[in-house]
Each structure stands twice: as C-alpha cells, then as structure tokens.
A protein has these predicted regions:
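Non-catalytic interface/linker regions that flank or bridge core catalytic/transmembrane domains
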Residues: 1-35
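A general alpha-helix detector
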Residues: 3-8, 59, 132-136
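Acidic/proline-rich low-complexity IDRs
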Residues: 10-11, 22, 53, 171-173
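Divalent metal-dependent catalytic cores for phosphoryl transfer on phosphate-bearing substrates
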Residues: 37-45, 51, 63-174
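Conserved hydrophobic/aromatic pocket- or pore-lining residues that grip, position, or stack substrates
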Residues: 56
Length: 174
C-alpha cells in the first residue's frame, strides 16, 4: 500500500499544479489510500481505491500516448488519479463502511459480509462520487474545463450523466 501511495503522490506532484501538496494532505487525511473502491465489485478491499486509481492511470497513460498524443500528460495524471476521489468520502465521513452482518447460532458474533463487504455510508448524504471528486480537488487545485468534464463523465453510459455525454466526447474523457 505504501508503494501505491508514494507513486500516486509522485505523479500528482509531477503535474506542478499549484495547491497539489495541500490536496495530497487532504487525500491522506480522508482515507483515500485505505478506502475500498466499491461495495462488492472491483477492489472492494482496504486500499482498493488508490490501487484502482493507479491502475486507471497506467491504462490512460499508455492509451493516450497512442490514440491522443496531443492530450496534456498532467491532465491524464490528474483525471486518472482523481476521477474516483469522491469515493473516499467527504465532510469527515467515509463513503463506504464495513457491511456487518448479525451472527447466528454457534457463530453469534457479527461478521463482515463476504459477498458485499462494504455498503454506502448512511450518515453521508448521497451525492454522485464524480461530483464529490471535483468538489474535493477544486478546493486545492484549478482543474481545466476538459479535466472537469472528464472526471464528471468518466462512468460514461453507466453513470448518472449518460444522457449528457452523447456528442460531447473529448479525447481526455475517452
């Protein structure tokens, strides 16, 4: 997990974006490096969010260099590593909490669900994580219009903004 954190910080600092050091402090404090990425699917485990974000960067870096070499490298880094930032939570509350099930019979102790290890935090008002990601990042760094769009639309046809995307795709979003 420490390697993932170090690599993430190294990449984000390499963008030279004013305020990035402050964003890194907030990411650490909010649990970005220890948060799961989902409730039960991809990387639903401690540290899954940071690992997923670094994996996305690896793919975006390779593909953008081949398909869209004109896209700014700093934008690729920022969008890849911050696209799911809101999944860590906000307002001092984690986005996901452990899904504890009641024990029964001989195993009366509560236990973490093996099929859905996490659930959305009922103490955190629901806001799309894409919106949270932009809000959190924008407190510290200036995102370009294209970076905002790419983060907001990163779930494509599977996200809540699917109807706003068609015909407005950009190389950074793709």
């Amino acid at each position: 997990m420490e390697n993932i954190k170090n690599r993430t910080e190294e990449l984000l600092l390499s963008t030279g974006r004013q305020g990035i050091a402050d964003l890194l402090v907030e990411m650490d404090e909010m649990g970005f490096y220890t948060a799961p990425c989902s409730t039960q699917y991809h990387l639903a485990c401690p540290g899954g969010l940071a690992e997923h974000s670094l994996n996305v960067y690896g793919l975006m870096d390779k593909l953008s260099g081949i398909l869209y070499p004109e896209v700014d490298k700093s934008s690729v880094i920022l969008c890849a590593l911050l696209h799911d930032l809101g999944k860590a939570g906000q307002f001092g509350k984690p986005n996901y909490i452990i899904n504890m099930l009641k024990g029964r019979g001989k195993n009366a102790e509560p236990y973490q669900s093996p099929t859905k290890p996490y659930i959305g935090n009922p103490d955190l008002l629901y806001i799309d994580h894409e919106v949270r990601s932009i809000q959190i990042a924008s407190r510290h760094i200036d995102l370009t219009e294209d970076e905002n769009w790419a983060i907001l639309m990163h779930n494509g046809m599977y996200g809540n903004f699917k109807y706003q995307i068609q015909g407005k795709e950009t190389p950074l979003y793709l």
